[in-house]
Amino acid sequence: MKKSKTHALSFYLIAILIVISCDIEKKIESPRIKSYLKIISPNSNEIIKKNDSIRINIISDSKEKSIKESTLLLNKDTFNFKNKINISTNNLLRYGRYNIKISTLFDDGSVENKSKNIFLYPDQKPKELEYELIKIITHDPETYTQGLLIDESKYLIESSGQYGKSFIKKVDMESNIIINKLMIDKKLFAEGITVYNDKLYMLTWKSNKGLILDKNTLELIGEFNYSTEGWGLTTIDDNLVMSDGTEKLFFIDPKSFKINNYIEVYDNNGKVENINEMEYINDKIYANIYGKDIIVIINYKTGEVENIINLEGLLNRENYNTNIDVMNGIAYNLENESILVTGKWWPSMFEIKIKEK
């Protein structure tokens, strides 16, 4: 028993020493390496307007060492300088966040690296356009419009949301007869739609799943996945362009479903979020903004909102006592260059033409 107690005592002593040793190690930490590179400008997350210069100013925060030379990396472009440099924004083609990386060599041979984020905004506010009302068309008030498009100038394809009630339908525009209709899995909330190579692609809201349908029959022929929410969808060349409720638009390969690229949508006041239903018209993206009776026209190469169409009052909500929700739905009629617009549970659809103010 005495020997056992001795072993136990030794064990406890060793355990105590280990705890004390660990505690000492925590207290005696490695000395923090002091940084001597100080970025005077730009400030973190500084807003730079297009056509303004990005003013770079760095200093050594030490009397013992001075800056010998510096290199700056911005948007894959490299600039050599010492303490100060002004960089034009003319070569920055897209709006939104940019990361500036600076590497500085001091006269003692040491090197320090630092970075700052800036945000590039357009310097002009969006130009407001007007519309001409061509006609008012009856719209099914049971349709919670999420996606809308005109196919072959004679069929209107529309997706409708809500869990347990989502569907997609194809309507003959001349007779207003439903040609095909497909109810969607009750676990899915239907969202935006687009056509690419005779296939119909449809997003769902929070399921990270998209559906591929036969354009003519609306038969389900495939699925695809994505990591964000699904909101609006359109097609530009060989890309599906998808919104997720943020300021970002993702350009997605319709075969591999990998993200090829993305842009951030901005106007002169900052990022434009809640981008909903979209339509590609005359080399621009026309988009609804969730909760607003407007259409914004986006330059898909830069992300700039170039124009805005105010559609407030298009639907007089005072005339209806039913559950009418927000504006959503843009479909381009190539034959007469008009646009169909509607909303979620709206009793009417409106054919309009856009014109200069």
Where are these regions (language model features)?
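Beta-rich, blade/repeat-based domains predominating
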Residues: 141-152, 185-197, 226-237, 269-281, ...
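C-terminal motif of bacterial Sec signal peptides marking the signal peptidase cleavage site
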Residues: 18-21
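Beta-strand-rich domains and repeat architectures in extracellular enzymes and scaffolds
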Residues: 134-167, 182-194, 343-345
